[in-house]
From Swiss-Prot:
Name of the top EC class for this enzyme: transferase
Major subcellular site: cytoplasm
Subcellular location: Cytoplasm
Functional pathway: Bacterial outer membrane biogenesis; lipopolysaccharide biosynthesis
GO CC terms: cytosol
Keywords: Cytoplasm, Lipopolysaccharide biosynthesis, Nucleotidyltransferase, Transferase
Family, similarity comment: Belongs to the KdsB family.
Descriptive protein name: 8-amino-3,8-dideoxy-manno-octulosonate cytidylyltransferase
Reaction(s) the record says it catalyses: 8-amino-3,8-dideoxy-alpha-D-manno-octulosonate + CTP = CMP-8-amino-3,8-dideoxy-alpha-D-manno-oct-2-ulosonate + diphosphate
Residues in the signal sequence: none
EC number: 2.7.7.90
GO MF term set: 3-deoxy-manno-octulosonate cytidylyltransferase activity
Amino acid sequence: MKVTLLIPARFGSSRFPGKPLAPINGKPMIQHVYERASLAKGLDAIYVATDDDRIKDAVEAFGGKVVMTSAAAASGTDRINDAIEQLGLSDDDLVINLQGDQPLIDPISIEQIVSLFERHPGEFEMATLGFEITDKSELDDPMHVKMVFDNDFNALYFSRARIPFGRDTNDYPVYKHLGVYAYTKRFVNAFAKLPLGKLEDLEKLEQLRALEYGHKIKVAISAFDSPEVDTPEDIRKCEQRLAVD
């Protein structure tokens, strides 16, 4: 089983145009993501998947690999699907989808999600990461997606609202979703052909499509947070974290 990590990156963003190239401590953000991913063991290849020449040039400037995808890609998964077809991966090869706005991703978290497939072959089609929320300001922030899972760590639901809701207490763990996915090439091909899900459209969370169509998502709980950069203000916070990392 070949393991390929893809970092989808687009230049356009309503909240933060040009986000992948935003400088963080003198390097474009996409370089931080790529270099952190390259520290993970067990990966056969890493590519940035983009439709923008500016991102392509920046990645190649630091020695990274790029696969150019269609500008018509409607979602991150569509971009991933386009990339894996170009790369000629086999149906059973493992694909890691790491968001391009996670410059603080810990390599161990990537290894953790890969090991799920290695330890449980054929038991599920998709896996992702969660982290127990420690910053209470994130509990009711819709930018931080919450998740619940069963006793076997199969995802039950993802929401921008706080889930679960404690009717009689606030003293219970709440987990947020970290935007890292793992799946086989075969599953990505099938997923990309599924119609938009009703819950997916309501919450604007693509992973809900898998649950709506009956697919199992296995969850690994990471010991490391991986906050996403959504606004220019997040850059400053990221630089502070990197200073002590």
